[in-house]
Amino acid sequence: MQDLNVFKNSYLIIGGPNTKKSEVSRGLSKKLNYKLINLDREKYNYFNDFTDYDEEKYYKLIEIKGKLKALNYIHKYEMKHLNYVIDNINDNSVIDFGNTYLIIDDKNIINKLELFDNIVLLVSNNKYNDEFINKLNRNKLLNELSNIKVNIDNKNVVNIVDEIINYKKFKDIL
């Protein structure tokens, strides 16, 4: 078993739907010259029900398949890829974890997140995030683990990336 907080220099980017996770991950990895690891399921074409990722279709798909079945399907996928990352990671990485909204209640995944020292939680006041924020408030562990919280509303990616880096600098001083 690895020690907790193994990946001290890496950043794990989490957040609800429409929170610019991929853009922020790319921007942060570029600015820090870190390796980018993308776990977004749409990049893997995980759902073969449609070829191009589409938010509306995605949520409809979950409703059609039944929430429990769809979430179980997603958990297996995300655990597989998170385990892969944990087994193969080098330090100095930015990990785009994909849609955290769907795994927020999975204790197996949340416990794995304890390995990361820098967990960046992106939040927004968009309509998709209301339920995510409610779930997050109920999930004390994930709330405590996300030690870098950024509200992305009315900010461009450069501002968000700078805010993340400044959070980290401030945290290191304390």
Predicted regions and their residues:
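Hydrophobic anchor at the beta1->P-loop junction of P-loop NTPases
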Residues: 13
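P-loop (Walker A) phosphate-binding loop of NTP-binding proteins
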Residues: 16
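ATP-binding Walker
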Residues: 19
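Walker A/P-loop
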Residues: 22
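ATP-dependent small-molecule kinase phosphotransfer cores
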Residues: 42-104
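Conserved phosphate-donor/acceptor-positioning beta-strand/loop module used by diverse small-molecule
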Residues: 111-131
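Small-molecule kinase domains that catalyze NTP-dependent phosphoryl transfer to phosphate-bearing small molecules
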Residues: 129-163, 167-174
